[in-house]
Structure formats: C-alpha cells, structure tokens
Design a protein with these regions (language model features):
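Conserved helicase C-terminal RecA-like lobe
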Residues: 353-359, 365, 378, 385-417
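N-terminal pre-P-loop "Q-motif" helix
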Residues: 6-22, 219
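Motif I (Walker A/P-loop) of helicase-class P-loop NTPases
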Residues: 36-45, 70-71, 220, 325
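A short beta-strand-to-loop transition that corresponds to the Sensor-1 phosphate-sensing loop
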Residues: 43, 61-65, 89-92, 238-241, ...
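A basic/glycine-biased coupling hinge at the interface between accessory DNA-binding modules
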Residues: 3-4, 22-25, 30-33, 44-207, ...
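Conserved helicase motor core of SF1/SF2 NTP-dependent helicases
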Residues: 33, 210, 214-290, 300-304
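Short alpha-helix plus adjacent loop in nuclease-associated cores
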Residues: 93-101, 241-248, 275-276, 371-392, ...
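Helicase P-loop NTPase motor core
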Residues: 27, 33-39, 263-266, 271-366, ...
C-alpha cells in the first residue's frame, strides 16, 4: 500500500512523472508548474514504494541553491535516508569523481580548482613570459574562447589563441590546477579512456534525475549520457522556453537531442501553472509560441485574473522608462497599500541597474541589488584564500604573487622576479 500523503496534491501529469520509474523520461515543465515538487515526490516514491536504495539515485541540479533546497525538502519527507541520495551540481559531481581518479589523468588528487580571476593572473604571466601583446588578444577574450572550446561551443582554436591555450594548459597541468571547464572535459576524458571507471559509476548511479536540462552544455549532456547508457533510467526535466544561459554554452537543443538519443522515452508535459493568473499566461503564451526550437505546449491556470494583470508601456528612451517605473512604484506604495519589498524590477543586464539606482536615490526609494557581487569574489576574501593556499603549498607562485604586497610592502616586480 502506498503512503500517499506526499502524492495527494499532485495533478495527473505530475503523478505520471512520479510513477514512471524505469526507462528514459523527458518532462517538459513550464514555469510555475510544480517541477521541483514533482522531482522531490519522485525520489520519495522511488525509495518508499519501489524500494530503490537511495545511494543508487543521482539528482543533478544546476545551482548549489537548488541542491540545498532539494536536500532540505527531501529530509522532511524521508529524514535520514535523504543523506544517502547523491544530490549535486554537475561541476561538483565531476570534481568528486576526479578527486578519486585524478591519477589516471596524471593529476594529483589534491588538484586546485581555479576561478576567472586566477585565470587572468595566469594568462598575465604567460603573456609576459611569451611577450604577447594584450591589445591583440586580451586575457578575458582568451579565457572566453578557451572556455567555449572546452565546452564544445567552439570547434577549433587557431593562431595566437591556440598558442595561448597550449601554454595555459601546460601551466595548469604543471601546477596541478583545473579550471571549471576542465572538471567537465577531464571527467568525460576519464570515462571514455577508462570503461571500467565509467561502469563503476553507472552501477552506482542506476537512477539519474536531471533538473534544468535546457541549461546544460554539450559536454555536460555527454557526461550525463555516458552515465545513463547502461541502465537507461534517466529522468530529465527542463523547459525549452526558459533557456537563458546560452552565453555559457548552454544548448537548448539538448532537450530535442534527448528524444533522438532515447527514442523510447516517455514524454510528459507539465502545463498547469500555480503561480500566475490565466490572463498573464495568455500573454506569455502569445509571445513564447514564436520560439522556433520548442516542444508545443500552452500553460494554463485555474486562477482567472483580470486584464489589468498585464500592462505594456512602450518607452522610446531609457529616461522615459526609468521615470515611468519610478512613478509606478511610488503610486503603488503611496496610494495602493503596497510595500517596497513587494516590488521587483527585472532588467536584461547588470549595466542597466545604474539608471534605476540614480532615480531611486533621488526619490528616496529603498532598494537592494541582488546577484551583483559574490562573496568569494571580493578582493579581501580572495587575498585570505591565497594566504592559506600558499601556506599549505609554498610552490604555488600564483598565490605568492597575489599576497606579496597585501598589505603593501613596497616589493617591486624586479625583486619578485
């Protein structure tokens, strides 16, 4: 008998997604259609009703936040068993696999994962040593090209870029370092060159769930495909109408490719929206239907709503747009009973926030900017991490050069050399 408390609030399509356990499943989940609840309920169902061991389940998420949220919600449902379910971002999963198997690729298991700031410093050293003109090829442009090449968004590097790439990879290997793209590329290489290692992880992860498939790039998709080849118990969830990470190499085509790679896959669509009103959804459906690469679907809601739910205001200049939004906020707060924290302003890129900030300061509108600067990217935090890494391994010259003048000690370039 099923203990169905966690299933009773699911709609028919969600329930089908939860109970279809064996074989490949592709779920097209529109915005606000209960995707996360369906994923959680499916894992609970697998453990409670199908007696699948939690350590045979791998759930791949796109962000650390999603990973933490999934684990917290699972703990409420299955308590201690939740800690045995593998829940991880693809980068974290690959890092753990490489820590255990790095020697097969001639890396040490204590390899260091570097970020973009470290990459710039390393390229600066390479440029200086090889007398490369940064006006011809800036380090940041080189980093982007190298990343695109590694995640297969770029097929070939030529000329100066190829030279820089080769020297960069040599430096990383000699210093036992990997960048974020290496975590993926080297895991894929490890699996292709060592079938026994691949089979070990295939046997460990017999049931694989993938969240936000539309945000995966080519290498990520290929790794997932290798892992699920033996048992084909792959459950992929995504929304082809919500792909926003193409600048990071994400391929919305992966959702369509899934159907080609798994021709027997069951296709399920979650289309009942629990967030918005039907009026808002009609507006969004009218816009989204023009997308060329998508699975046909139309979201609906049992909340009817009114015509005032959607307002379109055309502005010819950004000053007019900012003025209109500022006035709307003041009207909502002063005359309609809203609070400032009830309101969100969403813009296309970070550079546009400056115009709104100036207007909000002038009108004394309190605001917070979200996602502008990560804690670990702050200079002072990076400095402390470099101190700790250099203490742990004095051979790491990159970290030594960062901290030698923090605080200022008046040590010049010639002295450092």
């Amino acid at each position: 008998m099923e203990n169905s408390d966690y299933l009773k609030n699911l709609n028919e399509n969600q329930l089908e997604a939860v109970k279809t356990i064996d074989g490949p499943v592709m779920v097209f989940a529109g915005a606000g259609t209960g995707k996360t609840r369906t994923l959680i309920s499916r894992i609970v169902y697998m453990i409670k009703e199908c007696n699948i061991q939690p350590y045979h389940i791998l759930a791949i998420t796109f962000t650390k936040k999603a990973t933490n949220e999934m684990r917290e919600r699972l703990e409420k449902q299955i308590e201690n068993k939740a800690k045995f379910v593998h829940i991880s971002t693809i980068h974290s999963l690959c890092a753990n696999i490489l820590r255990r198997n790095a020697t097969y690729l001639d890396y040490g298991r204590n390899f260091e994962v570097i970020d973009e700031e470290d990459q710039v410093k390393i390229l600066n050293e390479i440029y200086k040593k090889s007398e490369i003109n940064r006006r011809v090829l800036s380090p940041k442009v080189a980093i982007k090209a190298i990343g695109d090449f590694k995640n297969k968004s770029c097929l070939e590097l030529v000329g100066l870029l190829k030279t820089v790439y080769n020297e960069y990879q040599t430096f990383l290997k000699e210093n036992n370092m990997m960048d974020f793209e290496d975590l993926l590329v080297l895991t894929y290489q490890l699996f292709k060159e060592n079938p026994n290692i691949l089979e070990y992880y295939q046997d460990e992860f017999k049931y694989i769930l993938v969240d936000e498939l539309q945000d995966t790039n080519v290498v990520q998709y290929d790794i997932i495909n290798l892992l699920c080849q033996k048992y084909e118990n792959i459950f992929a969830v995504g929304d082809d109408d919500q792909s926003i990470y193409s600048f990071r190499g994400a391929k919305i085509e992966n959702m369509m490719k899934f159907k080609e790679d798994h021709p027997k896959a069951k296709i399920i669509k979650l289309v009942e929206n629990y967030r918005s009103t039907n009026m808002i959804l009609k507006g969004s459906n009218a816009v989204i239907k023009n997308n060329k690469i998508r699975e046909p679907k139309e979201l609906f809601s049992k909340k009817v709503g009114s015509k005032s739910d959607v307002t379109i205001q055309e502005a010819y200049y950004y000053e007019d747009e900012v003025r209109y939004i500022t006035n709307e906020i003041m009207t909502l707060v002063n005359h309609n009973g809203y609070k400032y924290n009830d309101i969100a302003v969403i813009y296309r890129n970070g550079a546009l926030s400056r115009n709104f900030e100036i207007a909000f300061i002038q009108e004394k509108i309190p605001y917070n900017i979200y996602g502008s600067f990560a804690f670990l990217k702050r200079k002072e935090v990076k400095d402390m991490i470099s101190y700790l890494r250099f203490i742990a391994d004095p051979s790491k010259i990159v970290h030594f050069k960062r901290i030698i003048n923090v605080p200022s000690r008046g040590v010049g370039e010639k002295t450092i050399e």
